[in-house]
Amino acid sequence: MPAYDKADLERRMHGAVEALKSDLTGLRTGRASVNLLDPVTVEIYGAHMPLNQAATVTAPEPRMLSVQVWDRSNVGPVDKAIRSAGLGLNPIVDGQTLRIPIPDLTEERRKELAKLASQYAEKARVAVRNVRRDGMDSLKTDEKKGEIGEDDRKRRETEVQKLTDATISDVDAAAAAKEKEILGK
């Protein structure tokens, strides 16, 4: 059975792009986004769990997040988790609701976040190139085993390269859009 599997390569490359998009949603841009709190985990009942399993997060205003905690006894741990998440947010406790004003980003912080977005994009590019290398290696293996001919290998290598180029362009587009959003240009 041939080692080359185009569908697997596509799935893995798509996974790298999705991982990048997930990483980028966690970067604060100065506007309220419910995704901003996705990386926050809360210690409740002796276990760590994502914030969205203990509360409902909404963005009632462009510069305000609201976190409605389901169990009153968990308000303290949720407040602590948000403050210690490294997002620079300071919740205001109002009963079972935490109101989180989104502060303006300083120019220096914007540049740091843009640089971080670039690092995430480079990590995704490396992942895509690693998938490409795996695909090329499996094609060479198939040719050595005699399962495909040289012409077939070259044609499929061209397919893999086109897939790689398209995926890298998706990565670049996602990173450029996030950098533009962060820098406010």
UniProtKB/Swiss-Prot annotation:
One GO term of the biological process aspect: cytoplasmic translational termination
Family annotation (SUPFAM superfamilies): Ribosome recycling factor, RRF
Spans traversing the lipid bilayer: none
Region: Disordered, residue numbers: 136-161
Subcellular location: Cytoplasm
GO cellular component: cytosol
Pfam family, one: RRF
Swiss-Prot/TrEMBL keywords: Cytoplasm, Protein biosynthesis
Key word Cytoplasm present: yes
Molecular functions (GO terms): ribosomal large subunit binding
PANTHER family: MITOCHONDRIAL RIBOSOME RECYCLING FACTOR PSEUDO 1, RIBOSOME RECYCLING FACTOR
Protein purpose: Responsible for the release of ribosomes from messenger RNA at the termination of protein biosynthesis. May increase the efficiency of translation by recycling ribosomes from one round of translation to another.
Membership in a protein family: Belongs to the RRF family.
NCBIfam families: frr
Name listed for the protein in its UniProt record: Ribosome-recycling factor
Organism: Rhizorhabdus wittichii (strain DSM 6014 / CCUG 31198 / JCM 15750 / NBRC 105917 / EY 4224 / RW1) (Sphingomonas wittichii)
Gene: frr
